[in-house]
């Protein structure tokens, strides 16, 4: 027989047999209908409360035949509710619905929260867009103003360039004029220098002529004096003296004529148009004196510059010595630090240690010695001193503690 756990099918069979039993007059039919009703009620109870493998179930055929059997796992699997019963299924469904409702409510709340956040962000975005629009408007206005300023500046610059070109042309003309004037002055100076040279030459020649004339006059005066002496000595002889006196007078007249001629020559040379006046000569000598003064000033400045250079050489030599000393001290210090870094600290509790190390840096070297004491496993102290091996080096030292945990 086949078990029909469906409540609808069982109810239909029960209704069929009940209606048949009411119409029948046979007691067997009535009993059969009652049995079917009981089995159906039992099955309905199982449909509501559920069943499991091993429990008693009743199979009712279409003709009303009832078969009692123990439920198997296959019967439980074949049941519409998998043996759970309508009550359990409804309970599970109610629980699932409640859970789904809670999940839906939570999701709705989360969605509402997200919507609020999005609304806030949208409002912030709108405000930011408004600020951006305002900033863009301000930027556009500023750019427009800047463009106007650039245009105005360009026009003013163009005008200024034209004015500058005109001024440059005027300056160029002025420079050309000054250049021509300077050239004229240079030519005039060259001519003046030439005339000065010629004047100096003429003055030297006049001076030499004057000296020669003076020498001739002196010689002739001496000759006249000698002749006069001789005339006085010869006064005893009248005729002879008269003749000699006339001769001497003639010579004196000749000497005076020569003197007058020399004076005229000197005057002519002194008044010549090719000779500078005294004022012009004085001006030339003033310029020469100015050049001499400038030369003396330049000599003074040159001497001062030479002294300054000598002072700088002295300072540079001192600075070079200072740098050399600093380089040596630095290398000594690095060598001493290298030696100090090689010292060991004590490792055993309650023990002193004595340690030594050497260190070096380039051409300098140093020796370091130190001692330490470990008080506990966690705490120790040490100290050390280092001295360079070269002369004049200073000592370096360190003191340190160590705590471990």
Curated annotation (Swiss-Prot):
Pfam families: YadA_anchor. GO terms for biological process: cell adhesion. GO terms for cellular component: cell outer membrane; cell surface. Residues 312-350 are annotated as: Outer membrane translocation of the passenger domain. Residues 88-350 are annotated as: Coiled stalk domain. Residues 24-87 are annotated as: Head domain. Residues 87-170, 181-329 form a coiled coil. Residues 1-23 form the signal peptide. The chain crosses the membrane at residues 350-360, 364-375, 382-388, 394-405. Keywords: Cell adhesion, Cell outer membrane, Coiled coil, Membrane, Signal, Transmembrane, Transmembrane beta strand, Virulence. Adheres to and induces bacterial uptake by human epithelial cells in a microfilament-dependent process. Binding is reduced by pronase treatment, suggesting there is a protein receptor on the human cells. Possible human protein receptors include integrin beta-1 (ITGB1) and oxidized low-density lipoprotein receptor 1 (OLR1). Binds to extracellular human Hsp90 (preferentially the beta isoform, HSP90AB1) on monocytes, binding stimulates monocytes in a TLR4-dependent fashion, polymixin B, which binds NadA, blocks the activation. Hsp90 is probably not the first receptor on human monocytes. The signal peptide, cleaved at the inner membrane, guides the autotransporter protein to the periplasmic space. Insertion of the C-terminal translocator domain in the outer membrane forms a hydrophilic pore for the translocation of the passenger domain to the bacterial cell surface. The N-terminal head domain (24-87) as well as the dimeric coiled-coil region (88-132) are required for binding to human cells. The C-terminal translocator domain (maximally 54 residues) probably targets the protein to the outer membrane. The middle coiled section is responsible for oligomerization. Belongs to the autotransporter-2 (AT-2) (TC 1.B.40) family. The non-membrane anchored protein (residues 24-350) probably forms a homotrimer; it is assumed the mature protein forms trimers in situ. The mature protein without the membrane-targeting segment (residues 24-350) binds to human heat shock 90 beta protein (HSP90AB1) both in vitro and when incubated with human monocytes. This is Neisseria adhesin A. It comes from Neisseria meningitidis serogroup B. The gene is nadA.
């Amino acid at each position: 027989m086949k078990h029909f756990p469906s409540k609808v099918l069982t109810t239909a069979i029960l209704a069929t047999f009940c209606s048949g039993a009411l119409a029948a007059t046979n007691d067997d039919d009535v009993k059969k209908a009652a049995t079917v009703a009981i089995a159906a009620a039992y099955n309905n109870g199982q449909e509501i409360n559920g069943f499991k493998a091993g429990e008693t179930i009743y199979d009712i055929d279409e003709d009303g035949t009832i078969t009692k059997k123990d439920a198997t796992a296959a019967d439980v699997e074949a049941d519409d509710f998998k043996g759970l019963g309508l009550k359990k299924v409804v309970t599970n469904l109610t629980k699932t619905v409640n859970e789904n409702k809670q999940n839906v409510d939570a999701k709705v709340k989360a969605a509402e929260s997200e919507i609020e956040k999005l609304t806030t962000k949208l409002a912030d975005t709108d405000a930011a867009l408004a600020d951006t629009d305002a900033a863009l408007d301000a930027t556009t206005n500023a750019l427009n103003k800047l463009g106007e300023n650039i245009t105005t500046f360009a026009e003013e610059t163009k005008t200024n360039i034209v004015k500058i070109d005109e001024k440059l042309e005027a300056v160029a003309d002025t420079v050309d004029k000054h250049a021509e004037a300077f050239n004229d002055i240079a030519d005039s100076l060259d001519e003046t220098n030439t005339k000065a040279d010629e004047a100096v030459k003429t003055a030297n020649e006049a001076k030499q002529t004057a000296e020669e004339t003076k020498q001739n006059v002196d010689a002739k005066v001496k000759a006249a004096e000698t002749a006069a002496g001789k005339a006085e000595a010869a006064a005893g002889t009248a005729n002879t003296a008269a003749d000699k006196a006339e001769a001497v007078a003639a010579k004196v007249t000749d000497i005076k004529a020569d003197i007058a001629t020399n004076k005229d020559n000197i005057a002519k040379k002194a008044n010549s148009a090719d000779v500078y006046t005294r004022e012009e000569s004085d001006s030339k000598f003033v310029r020469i004196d100015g050049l001499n003064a400038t030369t003396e000033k330049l000599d003074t400045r040159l001497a001062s510059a030479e002294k300054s250079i000598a002072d700088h050489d002295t300072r540079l030599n001192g600075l070079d010595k200072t740098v050399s000393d600093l380089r040596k001290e630095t290398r000594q210090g690095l060598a001493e630090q290298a030696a100090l870094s090689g010292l060991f600290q004590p490792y055993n509790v309650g023990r002193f240690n004595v340690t030594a190390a050497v260190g070096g840096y380039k051409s300098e070297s140093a020796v370091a010695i130190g001692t330490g004491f470990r008080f506990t496993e966690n705490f120790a102290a040490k100290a050390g001193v280092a001295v360079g091996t070269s002369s004049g080096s200073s000592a370096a030292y360190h003191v340190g503690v160590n705590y471990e945990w």
